[in-house]
Amino acid sequence: MNQHSHSKTTVIDGITLNLSKPDTTNPEWIGQSEVLKQVLACWMVISDKDLPLSPRIIGMPGIGKTTLGMVAALERKQPLYIYQCTSDTRPEDLIVTPVLAESGKISYHASSLVTSMING
C-alpha cells in the first residue's frame, strides 16, 4: 500500500484503489460487561489456523450494537471499518465507487467492507 495525500491506496489489476480510513472514535462501554466478553470470546483464536466466529448482533436501533463492536475492536487493538446499511443501500455501495476527480479522471474508492477485506 502507498501513502498518498493522507489516504492509503492499493493497486489491483493496474487500478489504483483509494481505501477507506478506519474509524477513530473512542466510545466507552458502560454496563453489560458480559455481552462485551461474549463478543471478544467469539473473536479469540488459539492458533493461526483457527478462524474467529462471526457473531450476529441484532436488536432495535439505538441499543448499542455499533458501540459494542467499536469497543470490542478497541480492546483488541484492531482497526475498525464501519458501513451503515440503510434501506436505500445498493449492492455497488458495498464494493467500489467510481468518483470523478477534480482532474477529470475517474478515481475508485473502496467501501469500508472492501478496505477491511484488503487489510485483513
Predicted regions mapped to residue ranges:
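AAA+ P-loop NTPase catalytic core and its hallmark functional loops
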Residues: 1-120
